[in-house]
């Protein structure tokens, strides 16, 4: 019995020496006792205990959200509230959550931009974007200043210099549709860029107060929007991968425009954009025989304006250039479309 009491006393003394029990604590972990014994053993052997690397270095996480949350208190608010609202709306996010301050909304925007840097910009108001760009150019001019007597060309539109005349293009137009697709695509590209240049020169020749008016800004934005709409068409023409049915229709349109047959060009445009056969409604494939409506589904008869957004845009841009061509290179009223409206 005395041996048991002495052993209990020794264990109790060992726990007290190791300082394992703190105030108001009646138990300790076995791992803490083992760690204390290990330290005592190394001290008796003369080894110097070095802290582990995990204790020296802070715990890092591969999660960018956690890292951002740890450091977000140090970040100043570098964007205005209006810019934060605009960027959040672009990404379809609420501009303010319940109980959120302006700084919290800014931090939330930063997290969204880090996690999803790419934003879907497919469907948006292109005309408004062009107007905003023109307004920004005018604002930059006001901030930057201008020397007296200096010509104001900062806000002029880009002019495509094709180094050609309408007479040369009309001569080239006689060879359109003769079977040489590559030559036809080159003529189409040259003529459309020529019309864009004519349009830009007309807008650049306006007085400065006209350029700064609401209607003047709208006209400039329309020209820029048309140029951006036609870029996919120019790319397809350059790479020679324009679909055959689209190429055939555009060739007819350009040929009639060069002949100043604007009514025929408009008819060819409507044939391409709208088509002359509606898409059949209802079931067209029942059994082993196709129904009568199925025969009308053909690429030549279907509206290309409904195919995709890119085609719709450059078809719309082509129609605007048809109007510009009729305005600058007029002909008999019987061959024009809406002659009195121009």
From Swiss-Prot:
A Gene Ontology biological process term: mRNA processing
SMART domains noted in UniProt: SFM
Keyword terms of this UniProt record: Acetylation, mRNA processing, mRNA splicing, Nucleus, Spliceosome
Keyword Disulfide bond: no
Top-level taxon: Eukaryota
Stretches assigned to coiled coil: none
N-acetylmethionine, modified sites: 1
Cell location: Nucleus speckle
UniProt record similarity statement: Belongs to the PRP18 family.
Function: Participates in the second step of pre-mRNA splicing.
Name of this chain's protein: Pre-mRNA-splicing factor 18
Organism (species): Homo sapiens (Human)
